[in-house]
Amino acid sequence: MPRYEIRVNGIPRLVDTLDPNQPLLYALRFLGLTSVKYGCGLGQCGACTVIVDKKAVRSCMMPISSVESKPVTTLEGLGSADKPHPLQAAFIKGQVPQCGYCTSGMIMTAAVLLAETKKPTEAEVRAALDGNLCRCGTYGRVLRAVMVASGQGT
């Protein structure tokens, strides 16, 4: 059985799979990383978004074989309970989630935006998050939280 070594949240992990095209999403869930959600399986909803090599990617569409030797970051690796990432802190303070299903994907996508653009405009935030769907409609709170995390809101 083929074995893939992937570096998840800074830790090398081994994944055994018969299928090199197995989506990264399934491997991450198998490793116990439950922030990564299965939404549509087509890369259209953003619930499965993770950071691979400093880019926001849909893990349901990325074969496990394509991430070998590339750093993968999930929400669990972005911050911790005692030292949350500014986006995590802003989402908590702003009471952004309702059901929470989209939260991980929203935060991971926004984290890449803030790493590339320290003070994004509202239009840039909206453009970056386009394609991350929220069935509860918390888009306004998400936008405010991202602006707060970038130091541009209260």
Where are the model-predicted features located?
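Signature of N-terminal electron-transfer/Fe-S-associated modules in redox systems
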Residues: M1-T154
